[in-house]
């Protein structure tokens, strides 16, 4: 059984095959996707049309609009297939269905859904007039064009006036359809994770214990200040952190030390001499507690031993910390986490750290190497309608990775990334009692 990654890869390969006009390969890749979505059937229908097989295209578009009964562009293309098969009544019906799915809007822009095409209401009416011309209904065709002109489409006035002139001369009109080569593409955020990631990297010697090693790229190993102070003791900074709260460490800080290969601390002890070596001003040190939350994708050989697995995980966590979003806990009643997005904001945090054993509390969050902007709490249950959606239940906390537009967010929860309606959630700091689930608005469908 193919994985989600394999299916996305086949989808992408199919798109590339369409770009080079290799119709057979494109159909093969699109057909390999298990349980195809409406988008995939739509792609296959478009390929069949480009390959000159309207019968096969009609079957594919039938599947597409069955899977997604609101796919206006699917009804448009099915109407084109019916027109090419001289099924004029069915073609008119499909164009009427496409117009109905526009729901009074002047256009539907499919760009955000992966198709570089904007379906215009006037184009659907234009196609209806074209079918009426083919049936010899010239008066009806002229009336349909008048309706299209009444919608005042931007940039289409000349096209419609030229079409009206042809109809008056009883010259047939050519159908308008999705441009050749345009199909639904997989979301870019999925494509970024298709290539295998090398978490170990390449080994490189940066120091040698052999004094006579003359390799120009290698420097003799030097004794560090920590070694001179005594290798048996922890670093001054670690001691400073551990000297508070009786030597107890927060789980997030413990994980971050393990991930970076730092020394595993022992019980708290007097560290005055070590602090004198590290800095002349002990007050310049701040106790920082970092809570780390990461979702780490790993590719591990089956049967990997525990030690090797820990090494892989520590390397992956180290990379995640380079990309994670830092936040600090604000003062006040809500105690919300405020993102640290710039160097200036971090310096402002340092200036306002209170002088107390509690010190500074930070949070570092990341999802698949992507920073978390902020968190939201679900006010209602949301069931995923498509693979790119992220479902959740009332009360779930979701990490927001991107604000797609005014109505949609991209988020992460339980190792999964997807998009969801903004109206189903509220910021974590302002969570209120849930209200009845709102009815979806036409503009929120995708």
Swiss-Prot record:
Tissue localization of expression: Widely expressed. Detected in gastrum, spleen, uterus, small intestine, colon, inner ear, and brain.
Main subcellular localisation: cytoplasm
Residues in TPR repeats: 7-38, 39-71, 73-105, 122-155
Keyword Zinc: no
Keywords: Cell membrane, Cytoplasm, Membrane, Repeat, SH3 domain, TPR repeat
Cellular component per GO, a single term: NADPH oxidase complex
InterPro entries: NCF2_NOXA1, PB1-like, PB1_dom, SH3-like_dom_sf, SH3_domain, TPR-like_helical_dom_sf, TPR_rpt
Domain of life (superkingdom): Eukaryota
Gene Ontology MF terms: enzyme binding; SH3 domain binding; small GTPase binding; superoxide-generating NADPH oxidase activator activity
Domain SH3: 371-430
A Pfam match: PB1
GO biological processes: regulation of hydrogen peroxide metabolic process; regulation of respiratory burst; superoxide anion generation; superoxide metabolic process
Function: Functions as an activator of NOX1, a superoxide-producing NADPH oxidase. Functions in the production of reactive oxygen species (ROS) which participate in a variety of biological processes including host defense, hormone biosynthesis, oxygen sensing and signal transduction. May also activate CYBB/gp91phox and NOX3.
Subunit structure: NOX1, NOXA1, NOXO1, RAC1 and CYBA forms a functional multimeric complex supporting ROS production. Interaction with YWHAZ prevents the interaction of NOXA1 with NOXO1 and RAC1 and its targeting to membranes, hence reducing its ability to activate NOX1. Interacts (via N-terminus) with SH3PXD2A and SH3PXD2B; the interaction is direct. Interacts with RAC1, NCF1 and NOXO1. Interacts with a greater affinity to NOX1 phosphorylated at 'Thr-429'.
Swiss-Prot/TrEMBL domain comment: The SH3 domain mediates interaction with NOXO1 and NCF1 and has autoregulatory function. The TPR repeats mediate interaction with RAC1.
Identification of the protein by name: NADPH oxidase activator 1
Species of provenance: Rattus norvegicus (Rat)
GN (gene name): Noxa1
């Amino acid at each position: 059984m193919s994985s989600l990654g394999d299916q996305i890869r086949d989808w992408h390969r199919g798109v590339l095959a369409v770009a080079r006009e290799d119709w057979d390969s494109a159909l093969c890749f699109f057909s390999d996707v298990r349980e195809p979505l409406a988008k995939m059937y739509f792609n296959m229908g478009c390929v069949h049309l480009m390959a000159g097989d309207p019968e096969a295209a009609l079957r594919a578009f039938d599947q597409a609009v069955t899977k997604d009964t609101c796919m206006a562009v699917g009804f448009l293309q099915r109407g084109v297939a019916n027109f090419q098969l001289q099924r004029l009544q069915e073609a008119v019906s499909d164009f009427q269905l496409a117009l109905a799915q526009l729901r009074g809007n002047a256009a539907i822009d499919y760009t955000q859904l992966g198709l570089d095409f904007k379906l215009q209401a006037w184009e659907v009416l234009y196609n209806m007039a074209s079918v009426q011309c083919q049936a010899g209904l010239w008066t009806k065709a002229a009336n349909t064009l008048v309706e299209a002109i009444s919608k005042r489409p931007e940039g289409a006035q000349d096209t419609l006036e030229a079409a009206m002139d042809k109809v008056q001369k009883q010259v047939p009109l050519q159908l308008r359809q999705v441009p050749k080569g345009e199909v639904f593409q997989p979301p870019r955020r999925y494509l970024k994770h298709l290539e295998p990631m090398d978490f170990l990297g390449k080994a490189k010697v940066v120091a040698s214990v052999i004094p006579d090693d003359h390799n120009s790229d290698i420097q003799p190993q030097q004794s560090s200040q920590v070694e001179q102070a005594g290798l048996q003791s922890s670093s001054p900074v670690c001691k400073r952190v551990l000297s508070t709260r009786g030597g107890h460490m927060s789980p997030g800080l413990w994980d971050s030390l393990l991930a970076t290969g730092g020394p595993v601390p022992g019980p708290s002890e007097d560290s005055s001499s070590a602090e004198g070596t590290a800095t002349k001003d002990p007050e310049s040190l701040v106790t920082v507690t970092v809570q780390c939350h990461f979702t780490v994708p790993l590719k591990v050989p089956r049967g990997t031993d525990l030690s090797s697995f820990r090494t892989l995980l520590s390397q992956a966590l180290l990379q995640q910390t380079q990309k994670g979003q830092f936040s600090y806990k604000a003062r006040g009643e809500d105690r919300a986490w405020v993102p640290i997005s710039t160097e200036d904001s971090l310096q402002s945090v340092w200036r306002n750290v209170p002088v107390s054993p509690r010190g500074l509390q930070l949070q570092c969050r990341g999802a698949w190497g992507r920073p978390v902007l902020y968190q939201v709490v679900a006010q209602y249950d949301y069931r995923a309608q498509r693979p790119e959606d992220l479902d959740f239940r009332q009360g779930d906390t979701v990490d927001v990775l991107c604000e797609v537009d005014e109505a949609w967010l991209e988020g992460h929860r339980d190792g999964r990334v997807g998009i969801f309606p903004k109206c189903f959630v509220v910021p974590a700091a302002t969570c209120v009692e849930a209200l009845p689930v709102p009815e979806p608005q036409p503009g929120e469908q995708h």
